[in-house]
């Protein structure tokens, strides 16, 4: 049963808008969340995904603020994270409210080429923005927690987001190291999590106002860093999954008090049909759980109207960047390998080399070389040895399409493949060597075609103990 701390109730009752009922708020907090997912349009259209899943008993209710987001219902009680289609990266299990911040940042006329996600893990909003950018430009995704960087990286790869650069820093350093470098910044700030009580019944058990105020001080430092990293004319979205004013309106007001008319709040009242139900007088979205039957959430958007002074001297450029641009000969060789052996045309991005590794970097990344240490940049394409090139799994997942050198397998074979097993073929044919294994038109990974079977080349760290095949209801 949900645990609502009396001190929290006393505090939040003073902040609840007059047109909303405290009884309805408490009742909403006690209800389980509706299941929601976001279709990964880097791999499949929403219409094709619905056609794929409706025979398996899924029903789809559109989420008003995300054209590729849906509340879903189906009969099975299995963990969706084990579903074949989830492992493939066809969808992301994402709470509906958390789809709001990227939607607010990427309004229809937005054409952001260089975007920062300041607190990115586990990657729901990062991969949502990657899809909105259609893998164009550069998306820098930062995470302070080392263990969560690994989760972020895994989700970025699973979803086929190829234009990301990952960093592992305290978000407060970005204003210094990457001053006025980004067209747009999203900061989904670490917070008290008051809005998450519907999925974590103990979220408010030990709530205290002192802790809320302490968290808000960190948030103020983070939003200031994000604002300094934003180019003049750019947009910043600040969001939390908490409900109190200290961590929400108070943080935004602090930024405006600090930088005056350089901070221009943008109203979100027309972001989607019904947004006005959650709009504050400032134009922010303060989503109470009973309004849309969702998690509690807060979203604010602002424009940086002019440049502001940096707080510290510009840091020195870092030396010894380990990558160099591929020579014309090297670039031609890797392009030919992908085209001739794999049937993949490489995007017109930067081909970079480190030792015997070939990588694909977003062209926009060149402006960032030497300014900060990056954990991961773009895609690792292949390793090179005296025997030639060997493609990397992540490149296949992100770049392969139906025109590539593929073999389509059925669902039972796909399950076997993802569990690391070789696949026996019904009909023996001439051996074809390296081949891309696909299910439902989306790539699973590489195999070696030996004529009568596929020798599994799935990386060992991606082998699954359990793969769920959702049964057809037909």
Curated annotation (Swiss-Prot):
Q: Which reaction does it catalyse?
A: cytidine(1407) in 16S rRNA + S-adenosyl-L-methionine = 5-methylcytidine(1407) in 16S rRNA + S-adenosyl-L-homocysteine + H(+)
Which keywords does this chain's UniProt record carry? Answer: Cytoplasm, Methyltransferase, RNA-binding, rRNA processing, S-adenosyl-L-methionine, Transferase
- MF terms (GO), sorted A to Z: RNA binding; rRNA (cytosine-C5-)-methyltransferase activity
- Root EC class: transferase
The record ties this protein, via PROSITE patterns, to: SAM_MT_RSMB_NOP (PS51686)
Quote the InterPro entries the UniProt record gives: Methyltr_RsmF_N, MeTrfase_RsmB-F_NOP2_cat, MeTrfase_RsmB-F_NOP2_dom, Nol1_Nop2_Fmu_2, Nop2p, RCMT, rRNA_ssu_MeTfrase_F, SAM-dependent_MTases_sf
Q: Which Gene3D superfamilies match?
A: 3.10.450.720, Vaccinia Virus protein VP39 (3.40.50.150)
Q: Which CDD domains match?
A: AdoMet_MTases
Q: Which domain of life is it from?
A: Bacteria
Which residues constitute the catalytic centre? 241 (nucleophile)
Q: Which HAMAP family match?
A: 16SrRNA_methyltr_F
What PANTHER family does the record tag this protein with?
Answer: 28S RRNA (CYTOSINE(4447)-C(5))-METHYLTRANSFERASE-RELATED (PTHR22807:SF30), NOP2 YEAST -RELATED NOL1/NOP2/FMU SUN DOMAIN-CONTAINING (PTHR22807)
Record-given protein name:
Ribosomal RNA small subunit methyltransferase F
């Amino acid at each position: 049963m949900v645990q609502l701390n009396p001190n929290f109730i006393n505090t939040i009752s003073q902040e609840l808008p007059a047109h909303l009922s405290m009884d309805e708020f408490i009742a909403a907090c006690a209800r389980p969340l509706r299941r929601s997912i976001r279709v990964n349009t880097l791999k499949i259209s929403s219409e094709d995904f619905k056609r794929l899943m409706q025979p398996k008993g899924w029903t789809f209710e559109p989420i008003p603020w995300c054209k590729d987001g849906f509340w879903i219902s189906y009969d099975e009680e299995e963990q969706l994270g084990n579903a074949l289609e989830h492992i493939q990266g066809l969808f992301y299990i994402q709470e509906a409210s958390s789809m709001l911040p990227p939607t607010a940042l990427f309004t229809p006329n937005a054409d952001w080429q260089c975007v920062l996600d300041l607190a990115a893990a586990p990657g729901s909003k990062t991969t949502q923005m990657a899809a909105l950018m259609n893998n164009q430009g550069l998306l820098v995704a930062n995470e302070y927690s080392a263990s969560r960087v690994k989760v972020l990286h895994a989700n970025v790869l699973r979803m086929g987001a190829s234009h990301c650069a990952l960093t592992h820093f305290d978000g407060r350093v970005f204003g210094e190291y990457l001053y006025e470098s980004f067209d747009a910044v999203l900061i989904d700030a670490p917070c008290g999590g008051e809005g998450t009580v519907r999925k974590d019944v103990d979220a408010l058990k030990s709530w205290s106002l002192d802790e809320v105020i302490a968290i808000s001080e960190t948030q103020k430092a983070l939003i200031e860093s994000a604002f300094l990293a934003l180019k003049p004319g750019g947009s910043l979205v600040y969001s939390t999954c908490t409900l109190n004013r200290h961590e929400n309106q108070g943080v935004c007001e602090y930024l405006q008090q600090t930088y005056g008319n350089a901070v221009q709040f943008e109203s979100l009242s027309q972001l989607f049909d019904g947004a006005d139900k959650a709009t504050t007088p400032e134009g922010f979205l303060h989503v109470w759980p009973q309004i849309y039957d969702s998690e509690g959430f807060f979203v604010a958007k602002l424009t940086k109207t002019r440049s502001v002074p940096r707080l510290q001297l510009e840091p020195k450029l870092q030396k010894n960047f380990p990558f160099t641009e591929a020579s014309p000969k090297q670039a031609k060789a890797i392009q030919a390998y992908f085209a001739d052996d794999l049937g993949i045309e490489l995007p017109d991005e930067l081909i970079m080399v480190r030792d015997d590794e070939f990588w694909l970097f977003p062209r926009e990344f060149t402006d960032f070389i030497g300014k900060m240490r990056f954990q991961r940049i773009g895609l690792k394409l292949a390793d090179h040895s005296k025997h030639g090139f060997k493609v990397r799994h992540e490149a296949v997942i992100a770049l392969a399409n139906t025109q590539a050198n593929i073999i389509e397998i059925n669902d039972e074979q796909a399950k076997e493949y993802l569990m690391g097993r070789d696949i026996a073929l019904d009909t023996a044919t001439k051996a074809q060597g390296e081949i891309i294994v696909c299910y439902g038109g989306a790539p699973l990974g590489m195999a070696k075609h030996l004529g009568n079977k596929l020798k599994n080349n799935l990386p060992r760290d991606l082998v699954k103990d359990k793969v769920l095949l959702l049964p057809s209801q037909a």
